Amino acid sequence: MMEKNKRVLLGMSGGTDSSVAAMLLLEAGYEVTGVTFRFYEFNGSTEYLEDARALAARLGIGHITYDARKVFQEQIIDYFIDEYMSGHTPVPCTLCNNQLKWPLLAKIADEMGIFYLATGHYVRKQWIDGNYYIAPAEDVDKDQSFFLWGLRQEILQRMLLPMGGMTKSEARAYAAGRGFEKVSKKKDSIGVCFCPLDYRSFLKKCLCDESGDKNRNIYRKVERGRFLDESGNFIAWHEGYPFYTIGQRRGLGIQLNRAVFVKEIHPETNEVVLASLKSLEKSEMWLKDWNIVDESRLLGCDDVIVKIRYRKQENHCSVTITPEGLLHIRLHEPLSAIAEGQAAAFYKDGLLLGGGIITMTDQR
């Protein structure tokens, strides 16, 4: 087993949070090495690389870059596109953290003989009854625990999370107070890194631009389809089913004398069903690809909280495992706009207990 020394590999994005994390780790006596992953460079910008290198040099810590663009394309972006083509609503940040970012961090650390792993995530970690758990950050507005439900003990035991007890305003003040004015004024990242503004424009570029990368077979023809009501009656034409998500109201491009929302998406017929918000409510769902830290804290309990959207409403539920190996979630109160492909995360007693990917919202 690797020795637990004071060496730590820190994921450095060049932003405020990971930069402050580096300073906090140094103050705590750790020997810090920073690694900046090249996952996706929006508009081809590499300013984040230069900022991370400059900060590492100023702090006197080691720094490396790791080009993960190919694997990010294959595991995250292609997955993102495929899910929308299947009529689902993916959460790529969950997949990236659990299957790419943290495992890559561990792989590189292993090669360097480093035990501890760190990032600028706003989460905390707790050790209870023989298990490590992720716990929500002190700053509820910045808490990122929702995205980390898939991490297992081999990663959790190695994690250092210096930002978990800080608010964002405190982090900015901390950097400014130590003379890192540029770091303190960095803008927050918003949305998915490869389409921070609008996923639809990104999809249209990938799916509808025949000048795209045909070697990767990205181009797939998307034609206009039909909006239907719940009885199957035609309402209007739409741009193509991948450009809509369950629960969507805005951007439908139609005007009716009542509020309607996307209830169903049918890729095989290119049809999208619109209905009232009330009709979108569900009382149960099923999860695949799930992870649970400790089943005794979750299964059969009535006081579990489930979240299906980052920074959104919490709902009480009970959780069981089906004979087919899925997690069956029975909600105490109906929840609207549950979509296949979304992530669901479980909490109890202030701890993240696990989560999974929604695969069904009705018994079929």
Swiss-Prot record:
Region feature (Interaction with tRNA): 142-144, 309-310
Enzyme class: transferase
GO CC terms, sorted: cytoplasm
Source taxon at top rank: Bacteria
Pfam family, one: tRNA_Me_trans_M
InterPro entries, alphabetized: MnmA-like (IPR004506), MnmA-like_C (IPR046885), MnmA-like_central (IPR046884), MnmA-like_central_sf (IPR023382), Rhodanese-like_dom (IPR001763), Rossmann-like_a/b/a_fold (IPR014729)
Record-level Gene Ontology MF annotations: ATP binding; tRNA binding; tRNA-uridine 2-sulfurtransferase activity
Key words of the record: ATP-binding, Cytoplasm, Disulfide bond, Nucleotide-binding, RNA-binding, Transferase, tRNA processing, tRNA-binding
Catalytic residues as annotated in Swiss-Prot or TrEMBL: 96 (nucleophile), 193 (cysteine persulfide intermediate)
Cellular location(s): Cytoplasm
Cystine residue pairs: 96-193
Catalytic reaction equation(s): S-sulfanyl-L-cysteinyl-[protein] + uridine(34) in tRNA + AH2 + ATP = 2-thiouridine(34) in tRNA + L-cysteinyl-[protein] + A + AMP + diphosphate + H(+)
Role noted for this protein: Catalyzes the 2-thiolation of uridine at the wobble position (U34) of tRNA, leading to the formation of s(2)U34.
Protein name as catalogued: tRNA-specific 2-thiouridylase MnmA 1
Organism: Bacteroides fragilis (strain ATCC 25285 / DSM 2151 / CCUG 4856 / JCM 11019 / LMG 10263 / NCTC 9343 / Onslow / VPI 2553 / EN-2)
Gene name, Swiss-Prot/TrEMBL: mnmA1
